[in-house]
Amino acid sequence: SISGDQVDNLLNGNQIEPDGTLEWFDTNGVLLDKGTGEYNKHGNDSWAYAQRGFDFVMRDQFGYNYALKDKIFDTKSRDKFQRIIVKAAANDNYPFSYGGSGAHIRDAYVHHLSQLADLRVDERSTSSCILYLNGEYWGVYEMREKVDDTDFLSYYYDQDEIYRESADYLQYLKTWGGTWTKYGDGMPGPGSIARNDWDDFVDFVAANPMVNQVNYNQAKSQYNMGSLIDYFLLNSYVVCQDWLNYNTAWWRGMDPNGEKKKWRYTLWDMDNTFDHGTNYTGIPSSSPTAEPCDASTLGNSGGQGHVPIWNEMLTNQEFHDDYINRWQDLANGPLSCTFMIHILDSMIAVIEPEMPRQIATWGGTYTGWENNVTNLRNWILARCDSMNSGFVDCDTAITGIFDVTVQIIGIGAVEMSNSNIINNLNSPWTDQRFGGIDLPFEAVSGPFDHWEIISANTYVFDPNVDTLVLDLQGDVLVKAYFTPTRDITYNISPIGTATTINVDGVVISVFPTTISYPINQIVNISPNLDPLYEFSSWDSDSVILLPTSNSPVASFSSSNSDTVTLNIVKKPTITYMIDPGSTTSSINVDGVVINTFPTTISYPTNQIVNISANLDPLY
């Protein structure tokens, strides 16, 4: 709920910056927090609609509150916000956008999907809400997290300006029609430090072929290649029609103690997507069958070098393979048809109960909105069905697509490509992959033994190393064999002494301790005894202790899982005394003179002890 003398003036289209109050309620109408601050316009094309978005900046100078204190976004841990964005779906607004074609979800959906997919970009977190203006219902909105903000950058990445307007520690560039510096201006004069540094990087890539790995490594030290890949993949997948020359932001942190010190991308408005809106960028096609490689044809849209950099990086084999593998990692997971539709349906389910009141307030029909959502849903299904064949058609380096099945034999885990973990619990695991690129596998846990490749094609590889790289020629079954293991638990009886156990040269001092061994491995054990205790025996249920269980130094084969217990007993103690005690007499015990009494000595059981008296001359 927002209120203020002139806030309605702003939302009715007057570009003023009025003061006002914001109250934030939960779904049950319970007030969570409130404060006073400044409102300002949010949106460009969408500002022409009757239902408008706005930014809110809470100011502690008003004496009420310094930040909206609540965990607004389920995907984030942050719980204090001085600045927030409140949007009415922008250019996907229903009923106002593009002749009533909006679904009232696109922008929030793409940002949310990117977050759930853990793409290497920054997103505006989203939380659907309804808005009241001075007590009057104002419709379905989204609370959005502001990312081009030092509070955001400081909280998540420990990157911030040293002082306002400084060029140190933060460089942030934005393009919307033109390009400007958000952070990193530096001293007055032509250009900015951030722009100059970016231009230098663009020039370096243009002048130094990235097919040369040395040049590529140099570029990679300054530029987050994963962010570039994810940014181009996502915009190409959703067929964004106003990126590069609009809605493009990129930045890097300069604080050496912070994170994200390479240039990386931020998502901005993602509402002109999925064949919706005006084609401001001039992409070749906005249909579901648009080629995934279309971004490479866009010249230098926006004039900041993003596409020339992209095309140059694609000449590097490592980058190209990372790009294709990344697509398939995503296509088989968070950007799959199933997952994308699940997220869309779940987000629509949140706003659907409020859409009748939104429509009653602003116009349109419920059926019209439902049809728009159905069109969006069908477009997404058609798009994800076309992408793999589209890659094969437009990227001559790749072949396929082929089925890859990974099977784990034994107990262990394999990582395929990036973060696809296959273990003995989810094996066999089947995926679809392209040929013509390096597809990496690595055994990441368990006692790896060897690989086996079952295929109609021939592959040359070392079966005994824990990494494997395949250029697929057809369908393939990859078997990863792990040596069977047995768990041995070590214990001591009784507990509470200083005794430890030496196991293959490693001292175990915490009991019980369990160690996994390959089946039939020979294990050597011996006790390190507390001085007050002596060895009694070893106990086991199934493994055979050699030479016997009564030998302090022993070994066994890990043929079965078992508990091996070291039994110890307290040594007998002998106390020596002289009566009467006030003499110079002493006692010789095994050649050692004792002259302090009483003295207690512990001995192994049944040890022979020799004693003799050294008498005071008067006794």
Would you name each region that the model predicts?
Residues 436-464, 521-549, 582, 606-619:
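Surface-exposed interfaces of beta-sheet-rich extracellular modules
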Residues 418-438, 464-468, 505-518, 549-554, ...:
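Short, solvent-exposed S/T- and G/P-enriched segments that are highly enriched in secreted/extracellular
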Residues 1-15, 20-21, 30, 35-39, ...:
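Middle-to-C-terminal accessory/interaction subdomains
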Residues 399-403, 433-438, 484-487, 518-522, ...:
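Short coil/turn motif common to extracellular beta-sandwich-like domains
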